[in-house]
Amino acid sequence: MTCKNTRRLYQIITTFLRYGIDEIIPDIPLTRHARLGRKALFWVRNQHKDQPFGVRLRLALQELGPVWIKLGQMLSTRRDLFEPELAEQLALLQDSVEPFDGKSARQIIEQALGGSLETWFDEFDEQALASASIAQVHTAKFNQNQPLVGKDVVIKVIRPDIEPIIKADIALMYRLASWVPRLSNDARRLRATEVVREYEKTLLDELDLTREMANAIRLRNNFENSEMLYVPEMYPDFCHKNVIVMERIYGIPVSDVETLKANGTDMKLLAERGVQVFFTQVFRDSFFHADMHAGNIFVNPNHPENPQYIGIDCGIVGTLNQNDKRYLAESFVAFFNRDYRRVALMHVESCWTPADTDIDAFEQAFREVCEPIFAKPLSEISFGHVLLNLFNVAREFNMEVQPQLVLLQKTLLYIEGLGRQVYPQLDLWQTAKPFLQNWLNEQVGVKAILRDLKQRAPQFREHFAEFPEAVFNALQQQKQINFRLDELNKTLQAQGRQKSHNVRSIVSGVIILGVLWRFDDLPLWLSCGTLVTVLLVLLLQRKS
């Protein structure tokens, strides 16, 4: 470790000590050396004893700077790890820092674009429109040299020298995280190293603005001509790793409820559309904006009777596969049907908990945790907290962490919070239920079969010529099987006709499995077709 990193580590530890964060170290023999080292090396006392632990942790992270502030914000969404009071305090952390010099921003932008700003833009404002820990944004207009002359744009630029700062602090976070499991079983359950790894990936992704550009373009295409969501246009010719240029939008912040009401916005429809936008992203697109807090969501001030969201800052997104979506849809439906056994089986079938999990105990654990939720009316039940409860139970049964679902659960909490802030009577279940049912129907109904056949048509054509040969080979093998079975049958006649029939059935089953094994390199449909054909032949022979 370098001298600079050692000084930074010392600063981090002393800051935590001044806020009494070391009180989480349990007084047990295992931590004796840590407590002695703390007294010998760090003569620092808790200077904020009158404040609750959550407040002290928030203040400590605030003092340590942007990287730690963003860590606290991320942890505030991990309610599967922390008590609600602590998570609520961390949610108060604000990722707002003093902007860096506008002239420096100009230099960075010009270096990225390869020329003077005046080549492309007029009215570049060196005063930042907004500033955060990773980047800040400036406004400008396309000039007469551009096809979109006069178009208002926003230029986002990464803070200079932020990457080495982030990497240095992340390295120290890993070092601190490696100490956490030694404290107690509860500390081990936090899986601190996994949390830091997840945070590192998020931060490094945010440092590459070309990712944000690609995400925004994809989300914009998904909701092209949509009445529900508008995503500002990106201008790829001006986008680089540390600079992007996008359309400037003018909207009402979704958290400004009074202005929305004064503008005549249909608040009920606005709240319902927030849920619809989220579930459309999840179940239709398998791709969702995963940073949908109030600062990134606006409402189009035009046509308030038909309100439209505007989404910005697509630096953090989530993706889901078919298995993830099936888990979500079936788990939610099973939960609301109080079918806790199905919920338990879903976790095992998804391979997220061990195959030898005790299903009865798993079901009972879900029942004990989830049943009290139904003391509330269905309209008041939080989907985010349902997922949280499912995760908490599953973790006790060694569920592997699923980062994509943790990200989704965080986003769902954001959406629910905003929806109920806009319209407190929002019925999440009634709004979301059609999405869940339609998706499940499409996966298991006639439509799903026809769609699958259509998708596999090229494979059918490619392998169709193999089908007659496969059937012929299977029938030839069946003739040999029948001959051998007849020979065997003669020797068993003395033992009774029933036993003979049983042997024939058993051996036939074994041979059929062998036939299928021989065709394991064929597509599933062809193997199944072969099996059906062989079975029909067996039935016909049995009748004869």
Curated annotation (Swiss-Prot):
Q: Which GO biological process categories is it annotated with?
A: regulation of ubiquinone biosynthetic process; ubiquinone biosynthetic process
Q: Where in the cell is it found?
A: Cell inner membrane
Pathway info: Cofactor biosynthesis; ubiquinone biosynthesis [regulation]
Output the Gene Ontology terms for molecular function: ATP binding; protein kinase activity
Membrane topology summary: Single-pass membrane protein
Its chief place of residence is membrane
Q: Where is the Protein kinase domain?
A: 123-505
Membrane spanning segments where?
522-540
Descriptive protein name: Probable protein kinase UbiB
Query: What is the organism of origin for this protein?
Result: Actinobacillus pleuropneumoniae serotype 3 (strain JL03)
This protein's encoding gene? ubiB
